[in-house]
Amino acid sequence: MSTSSSTSHAADTHDLIRVHGARENNLCDVSVEIPKRRLTVFTGVSGSGKSSLVFATIAAESQRMINETYSTFVQGFMPTLAWPDVDLLDGLTTAIIVDQERMGGDVRSTVGTATDVGALLRILFSRVGQPHVGSAKAFSFNVASISGSGAVTVEKHGRQVKERRDFEIVGGACPRCEGRGAVSDFDLTALFDETKSIVEGALTIPNYSVDGWYGRIFAGSGFFPGDKPINTFTKPQMDALLHKEPTRIKVDGINVTFEGLIPRIQKSFLSKDREAMQPHIRAFVDRAIVFRTCPDCEGTRLSELARSSRIDGVNIAEACAMQISDLAGWIRELDEPSGDGAQRSSTLGAGDGAQRSSTLGAGDGAQRSSAVSGVSPLLASLRETLDSFVEIGLGYLSLDRPSGSLSGGEAQRTKMIRHLGSSLTDVTYVFDEPTIGLHPHDITRMNDLLLRLRDKGNTVLVVEHKPETIVIGDHVVDLGPGAGSDGGQVVYEGTVEGLRASGTRTGRHLDDRASLKVDLRTPTGALEVRGASSHNLRDVDVDIPLGVLTVVTGVAGSGKSSLIHGSVAGRDGVVVVDQGAIKGSRRSNPATYTGLLEPIRKAFAKANGVKPALFSANSAGACPNCNGAGVIYTDLAMMAGVATTCEVCEGRRFDSSVLEYRLGTGDEARDISEVLAMSVAEAEKFFGAGDTRVPAAHRILERLADVGLGYVKLGQPLTTLSGGERQRLKLAVNMGESGGIYVLDEPTTGLHLADVEQLLALLDRLVDGGKSVIVIEHHQAVMAHADRIIDLGPGAGHDGGRVVFEGTPAELVASRATLTGEHLAAYVGG
């Protein structure tokens, strides 16, 4: 039976993702229809509900449904995903989230280990490297070399006999630093007070108090007297305190493992990335431990055996240290006939070329060519992946770069690498502001990559503020009209042309262009930087103007952060406001972080004649059922734990008796839970006048509103804030400090086009108030508003690291001598 070609197949009718009645967070029964296999951009002011719709509803439900296809046992190892609050979700496909979360905090995690490149490179050296030293494990700094022997029972001629067997695993980890690349020296005076005994609290290590479990273990170990000052210990006793191997002991009738202070600290503290530590732990590590490059492996993390094997004169440590754009060229040349030594030597320099010439004889060259031809598919895969790094604007990185040191934007683009060459189609890719950290020159390349994913038959959902990316969308969903409780509605859905004519805030500001600043401030002094050479900086000498707004520009990887964070941030009077995670428990919120809760609690206590502690969910006022958490965490053994709203307090966190106390009179009176449910803008009005006026609280709320956080709720968990929101929260806190120089790292991150003007006004107020403001930024509106610009480049990595321009924005536009100058000129129409 034949079917007419004009008749569409039933399967072709499922070309939409339908969302009906979405109510996550501030969404107000949102209903949208998103076309599949198209690029859809979600826009709107900060806090309008974009992430709630895209991440908390569409992507979350897709991932939850996929997780449910696995067995209960496997689900126990997966994150718990709650049902989104929505009436209907239809037409979902597999969602892959490419977010800005930083990659791995482990000290051994690098760009190479976080992608497939490191593994492919290890296989290449295990197959082609000379001399041959072992399998791919022999080149991994995460695998230690171990050997052993023992007796095994085997059956021979009908009898069981014991035979001695040996085994050996050849790993690539440097035995001295255990693959960390650095060794540590301990300042013992920071570990303990030698004039005190253990029971008197001699140990000054975090969490080692005499009342704590660790303190009890050391006091009752029996390896040294716990009641005598440490400076009276004998040498064996001191060795036991500091270096004792793990030993089972009994303390207070409980079997525990005792281990010396230094190995225990190395395992519990030094195995973590420094930036992932809690502030008090980080302060202790900085105080007690001095890190230096491992003298055995010279920071490469690899054993001498792993470093002895070479391909064309290059060992794996040298390959990983190359800039990725150079490594891609070196891999490409391996496929070429040997004899191109002159060309090949240009990759790493003349000295390396000479080394290769001496390493490879005529016979060795033929042998290498034969070996390389046997791994051609591997080389092709390596080339493709490394070329993707270059295409995505990350060619300036190296594979040995710690992954924890990548910015949120760099981490997001690194995660994109694995998807660019994927053979999957009909997948939904979800991106959270992919242009973060990108120079205008690099945004075009990012747009091309998004379009490539779409053209392979995938659905691409992008949350974005940059007009350069909004305009490439096939479909636009604009949320608003405001933020928080004033948002959560779809104010426009359709094409980019329709958005321009829609009259929404996004539509009105889509084609905004800032003009060059006319009234420039005169610097009052200069901050001298001499011989800056960290990372890719080339002995940079620069005078950073004081008393003005200085914007530091340049393509990604040009050396901006290295210059400012490496040479300015550590000086006296400098306040650095970055986008790093804010450490705290899941109970932490803007009210606790900013100190706002303290004057609020005192105001409640004074108005009701009770103690302030009653108005803390972490203290006397906590709900007795959930202990002030607002939710009950249930451990389901092999299945994932479940968090359910507390039935007693209904998520309000406080005891019912506390909620009877109110602040204010009449209809305006509020209890403490209602205050914490307010947005910053609502609380600013509440505490700004009348019976509820609290000046100390109002000052903090004014600063929060000034930095564009008026939509954030006072009791909102800090873990729900984006990188840009975290930075603005830190800025609000630091605005109350006495520092004279403020350093801001891309403060426009997460800001809507309409909010950038508010940020510029805030920066002006800081400078007019006597502060010096240094901003690392890519946004052309901020560049145009600067008093002075310092542009680094001309390229990224070893192609950058130089100051290519110093002067006013008008001078930069007039010269157009740099990439930044060209794009700023195009932006202002110069």
Which residues make up each language-model segment?
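Conserved phosphate-binding elements of NTP-dependent enzyme cores
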Residues: 1-830
